[in-house]
Regions:
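Residue(s) in the substrate-gating loop at a strand-loop-helix junction
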Residues: 140
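Alpha-helical segment proximal to the catalytic Tyr-Lys
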Residues: 125, 169-173, 230
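The beta1-alpha1 cofactor-binding region of Rossmann-like NAD(H)/NADP(H)-dependent oxidoreductases
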Residues: 59-70, 102, 215
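Canonical Rossmann dinucleotide-binding motif of NAD(H)/NADP(H)-dependent dehydrogenases/reductases
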Residues: 3-35
Length: 246
């Protein structure tokens, strides 16, 4: 493992209790950061055997009040937030667009897009005050390509890409970098929400012929949240195994 220097940094990872999120939590903590997991699943975060430099706060990213409370709790313990990774997300069920249940559409968009906005809205002012921050939003190859039978997820993840570009420009005169990654699928708990037909479809589109490994995403993101990434902002970093066409 290449070592990235995150010493003395305070990092928040939403949806950090499993999958992509926990892989980043582990990588950041091994690189010297103090990490705070924001996750809605109380039972999950209580079951984790966390390193000394990792704590968890129950957070519902669809509630701005919950996000604000988590910011206050994190700042009360650590005085700052240097790194924010907006990773919390769900895939939602598989339906044709015209058959998609309205409540399920809203649920996916609330978590996958509005949750990113809420966390940025609550955290960015503190980064501006300290003139330092690194934000990475976890989008998806679906946000570029638009997966069939996954319209809300694809639309929300496309929105995350646009949000990243807008926020990156707004903060470009400060020592704050805002970028996003567009991973292909990985074998995480999110697969429990997806039909086998859709899983097979996603794999068939990846030229490398395999799904992404969670530590491969963590490796890229660990550099994006480091001080070394002092120039690139508002950018989209591909992790699709060759699937992306732009």
């Amino acid at each position: 493992m290449n070592q990235i220097d995150l010493n003395n940094k305070i990092a928040v990872v939403t949806g950090g209790g499993q999958g992509f999120g926990y892989s980043m939590v582990e990588r950041f903590s091994q690189s010297g950061a103090t990490v705070v997991i924001w996750d809605k699943d109380k039972d999950l975060i209580e079951s984790l055997n966390l390193p000394k430099n990792v704590t968890a706060v129950q957070t519902d990213v669809t509630s701005y009040e919950s996000v604000e409370n988590s910011v206050k709790e994190t700042l009360s313990k650590h005085n700052k937030i240097d790194i924010l990774v907006n990773n919390a997300g769900i895939a939602g069920p598989s339906f044709k667009t015209w058959e998609y249940p309205i409540d399920q559409w809203q649920n996916v968009v609330d978590i996958d897009l509005t949750g990113v906005f809420y966390c940025c809205k609550a955290v960015v002012p503190h980064m501006v005050k300290s003139d330092y921050g690194r934000i990475v939003n976890v989008s998806s190859i679906a946000g570029k390509e638009g997966n069939p039978n996954a319209m809300p997820y694809s639309a929300a993840k496309a929105g995350v890409i646009a949000l990243t570009k807008s926020l990156g420009k707004e903060l470009s005169d400060k020592n704050i970098a805002v970028n996003c990654v567009t991973p292909a699928a990985a074998k995480t708990r999110i697969f429990d929400q997806i039909s086998q037909e859709h899983i097979d479809y996603m794999l068939s589109k990846i030229p490398r012929g395999r799904f992404l490994k969670v530590d491969e995403l963590a490796s890229m993101v660990s550099w994006l949240v480091s001080e070394e990434n002092s120039y690139t902002t508002g950018a989209v970093f591909d992790l699709s195994g060759g699937r992306a066409t732009y």
